[in-house]
């Protein structure tokens, strides 16, 4: 298994109430992953991308896309695979929240505007 394959496995984090609750209480991180990825590949990808993190367990599930109506036509969202990654106690994956990044850039631009 090469490093290029490992970089393509993790598609992104899942930000939901359930994933936040699991992360805070049990140390579980939730990711969208490649639909053909195995549990071992997910474990290696997380340990490679987030240095110093030890993965204890990986649970995966396939999520069926919802059927949605767009006016008269019926469409369907894409299916995807999700992984619940349990980390060793006391460890955490550092991911930037989009809201925090926007708030930080807004604060820094307003500070520079006031200084000028």
From Swiss-Prot:
- GO BP: translation
Residue ranges that the Swiss-Prot or TrEMBL entry lists as coiled coil: none
Q: Which UniProt keywords apply?
A: Ribonucleoprotein, Ribosomal protein, RNA-binding, rRNA-binding
Which SUPFAM superfamilies has this protein been placed in? Ribosomal proteins S24e, L23 and L15e
Q: Which Pfam families match?
A: Ribosomal_L23 (PF00276)
- What InterPro entries would the database entry show? Nucleotide-bd_a/b_plait_sf, Ribosomal_uL23-like, Ribosomal_uL23/eL15/eS24_sf
Keyword RNA-binding in annotation: yes
Q: Which GO terms describe its cellular component?
A: ribonucleoprotein complex; ribosome
One function term, GO molecular function aspect: structural constituent of ribosome
User: Which domain of life does this protein belong to?
Assistant: Bacteria
Q: Which family does it belong to?
A: Belongs to the universal ribosomal protein uL23 family.
Question: Quaternary structure?
Answer: Part of the 50S ribosomal subunit. Contacts protein L29, and trigger factor when it is bound to the ribosome.
Relate the protein's function as given in its record: One of the early assembly proteins it binds 23S rRNA. One of the proteins that surrounds the polypeptide exit tunnel on the outside of the ribosome. Forms the main docking site for trigger factor binding to the ribosome.
Name of this chain's protein: Large ribosomal subunit protein uL23
Which gene holds the coding sequence for this protein? rplW
